[in-house]
Curated annotation (Swiss-Prot):
Residue stretches spanning the membrane: none
A GO biological-process term: meiotic cell cycle
Lineage summary: Eukaryota, Metazoa, Ecdysozoa, Arthropoda, Hexapoda
Gene name of this polypeptide: mit(1)15
GO CC entries: cytoplasm; nucleus; RZZ complex
Subcellular location: Cytoplasm; Nucleus; Chromosome, Centromere, Kinetochore
A Pfam family reported for this protein in Swiss-Prot or TrEMBL: Zw10_middle
Originating species: Drosophila pseudoobscura pseudoobscura
Cysteine pairs bridged by disulfides in the record: none
Protein name, UniProt field: Centromere/kinetochore protein zw10
Length: 718
């Protein structure tokens, strides 16, 4: 029943599509097949002539495309005649008709392949026509469509059509022709671009001249730039030229810039750059070269970008020509701009800092670069970070400048000195006002050093915010610490060998200590520690010199010897006079340099050491004759006469602890046994202030012969 129903259904289907019977359908299919095969043969011949034999062929692919469309419609009509249900009926009644249906589908696929090739051929001809009119955007579009058809990109054809097409013999030839056309297009566009945008560089022995010419024909420039950059253009050569010959020199060198907006009879905008290529003669390279002013650099940059603005067209919603160029140059450009132009332009003084518009200028320039699409400010934050760190850069520059000045002052001779506080006498300092600095000499360099510190304190600083560091914080401490650390190194030999040098360094440190204390309320950081360090450093080097001078006296006195047990001889007197001369020399270099109280206390110490050594040597003599006692008395007289003259006020000599001891020793050299015992007065006399009983007994034994009277006197020394 089902089979009879299907057979009954078939005539109705064929009649509705213009076929009276199955035989008519077979005949129609056969005719279409024959026509299609003939058509494909003609298409094959056309393709062979164009892509295999490369013969001249004036046949337009349009004729083939129209015929292909007509055949396609007929085949589609036949396929509709034998639909899904009809095909099932045919399968049940006639395998032959089903085969014809499949043949129709294969014919249709072959026809589609032919049509695909014809479309490619038509596009090749359109490319040639568009090239004649130099309409590069049209050519670019046609070449893009060619690529889609040849490589099966997008929805240009079904996968079956592309698969069969790419398996044909003509495919490789078509592909080669496409690549030739694409290369010629790229070459022609590059040549045209090079005529519209001319980049020239002339090198001379010590200089270079760079010229940029950009056409004012906006329409042509727009089309060629859009076409060139959309066709996978590699801008490396352009970017390298701009970076090497324009951007880097503008940042690193003084550049002569000339702009002519009506060059070449008004058809081009011209920018000329000229600069020296002579290398610096020092190893430090660019650091010693004359740097251009940052304002000049930014202005020249604007001129460069304005000159090239004619090529800065939009390629897409998110990309411009400058953004492509920026991808190649911005890292190097930003690095040089920040490190070699902007950071060196940061002010070094507070006056310059307050007058500077550097941050505002950089912010405006960054916005200009962003508006030109050369950078993306959200990603390329080099200039923003410079602005954020501007305070730190300023502080570093200020400290570097101050440190440089500090080191220059430290190198100066300490011996070049100047009087300070000339009216502050010792009695005024110790009595009236202990905060006065005493009259003394300091190095002229120390005075210059103090002036530098005062200048820093006078800087008109604004109160920093909560998150903003005071740019001057710690600068004074850094300067003084550098002075403390560096002076002993720089002047090491002189500090060790020349007495006046160490004294001046001591005075300098005390001078700075007094200044720091006076300015403690002005925000000097680590004030107590600085005062202690300055005092300790100055005192230490001074004490080293005092110890050295004491050792000189001790070395002289080490040769102190009596000529014989009975006579003193001339040697001891010479040694004593030599010590006094040494002290006299020291007085000449110290008295007018040190503050009076320091000088007095120092000479009190030196005299005490000298007198003690003299007394010690006298007490080593076990037998002192009357003649020798007289000579010793005269020798002591020399000391008693000369020592007071070492002080401005001779009475200062009484501050020497061993002074009275020496005077009493002279008295005992000339005294009788009775007088000595009376001076002792059973331990209550004046001798007890400076001598012990053992020392007096020893001296009595040395001065007097062994008698009952001497023995009795010795028993009284208790």
């Amino acid at each position: 029943m089902a089979a009879r129903a299907q057979i009954k259904l078939l005539p109705e289907m064929f009649q509705s599509n213009g076929c009276a019977s199955l035989e008519d359908t077979k005949s129609t299919v056969s005719k279409v097949q024959t026509r299609t095969e003939r058509f494909q043969e003609r298409v094959r011949k056309h393709i062979d002539e164009n892509y295999s034999e490369f013969m001249t062929n004036h046949t337009s692919p349009d004729i083939f495309l129209e015929e292909s469309s007509s055949l396609g419609r007929e085949i589609n009509d036949l396929l509709e005649t034998v639909g899904t249900e009809g095909l099932a009926a045919l399968n049940g009644s006639s395998t032959q008709l089903a085969d014809h249906s499949r043949e129709l589908r294969e014919l249709m696929l072959g026809l589609q392949v032919s049509e695909h090739i014809l479309k490619i051929d038509e596009l090749f001809q359109c490319v040639e026509e568009a090239k004649g009119t130099k309409d590069y955007l049209v050519v670019l579009d046609l070449v893009g469509r060619l690529r889609s058809l040849i490589y099966g990109e997008g929805e240009a054809a079904t996968q079956d059509v592309v698969r069969i097409f790419q398996a044909l013999e003509c495919y490789e030839t078509i592909k080669v022709k496409y690549h030739v056309q694409a290369h010629l297009l790229q070459q022609n566009m590059q040549e045209r671009f090079d005529r519209l945008v001319q980049l020239n560089c002339k090198s001379f022995p010590n200089s270079k001249c760079v010229t940029l010419l950009v056409s004012k024909e906006e329409g042509q420039l727009h089309d060629i730039v859009i076409a060139l950059f959309q066709e996978r253009y590699n801008p490396v050569r352009l970017c390298e030229f701009l970076l090497e010959n324009c951007i880097e020199p503008l940042i690193l060198k003084p550049v002569g810039v000339e702009c002519n907006e009506n060059a070449e009879a008004g058809t081009y905008v011209q920018l000329s750059l000229s600069y020296s290529t002579k290398e610096s003669g020092t190893a430090s390279g660019t650091s010693t070269q004359l740097r251009p002013n940052y304002k000049q650099v930014l202005e020249h940059f604007r001129l460069l970008l304005q000159t090239l603005s004619g090529i800065n067209h939009s390629l897409s919603s998110s990309q411009h020509v400058f953004s492509i160029i920026g991808d190649h140059v911005k890292d190097r450009m930003m690095h040089l701009l920040v490190n070699d132009c902007l950071i060196p332009a940061v002010p070094e003084t507070m006056e310059e800092y307050q007058a500077s518009t550097l941050c505002e200028d950089v912010a405006h320039f960054e916005q200009y670069l962003a508006d030109s699409f050369l950078i993306n400010p959200e990603v390329d934050r080099g200039l923003s970070q410079f602005i954020e760190q501007y305070g730190t850069y300023y502080r570093n520059r200020l400290c570097s400048r101050v440190l440089e000045s500090t080191r220059e002052i430290i190198q100066r001779d300490l011996q070049d000195m100047v009087l300070v506080a000339p009216n502050n006498q010792a009695m005024d300092v110790t009595g009236c006002d202990p905060f006065l600095f005493p009259r003394c000499m300091v190095s002229r360099s120390a005075q210059d050093f103090m002036k530098l510190m005062e200048r820093i304190l006078r800087q008109p600083t604004e109160k920093p915010g909560e998150d903003e560091a005071d740019p001057l914080a710690g600068v004074i401490g850094m300067m003084l610490q550098t002075y403390i650390d560096e002076v002993p190194k720089v002047h090491k030999k002189l500090l060790e060998s020349i007495p006046q040098q160490s004294v001046l360094f001591h005075n300098n440190c005390m001078y700075f200590t007094h200044w720091v204390a006076q300015n403690a309320n002005k925000g000097i950081e680590s004030f107590p520690a600085l005062v202690k360090t300055l005092q300790a450093t100055g005192t230490m080097h001074f004490r080293v010199q005092v110890t050295y001078q004491t050792s000189i006296l001790m070395d002289i006195m080490e040769s102190f010897e009596f000529e014989s047990p009975h006579t003193l001889g001339t040697g001891p007197l010479k040694l004593v006079r030599q010590c006094l001369r040494q002290l006299e020399l020291l007085k000449n270099v110290w008295q007018n340099v040190l503050p009076d109280n320091v000088y007095n206390s120092t000479f009190v110490e030196l005299l005490h050491a000298f007198i003690n050594e003299l007394v010690r040597h006298i007490f080593t003599q076990r037998d002192i004759s009357a003649t020798m006692a007289s000579d010793l008395s005269d020798l002591i007289d020399v000391v008693l006469e000369k020592a007071p003259k070492l002080f401005r006020d001779p009475h200062e000599v009484h501050q020497v602890r061993s002074w009275m001891k020496l005077q009493q020793l002279k008295t005992m050299m000339n005294a009788s046994l009775k007088e000595i015992t009376e001076l002792w007065c059973k331990g209550a006399g004046p001798l007890t202030a400076n001598y012990k009983a053992d020392e007096i007994r020893y001296l009595i034994r040395a001065l007097f012969q062994d008698t009952d009277r001497r023995a009795k006197a010795i028993t009284q020394i208790m």
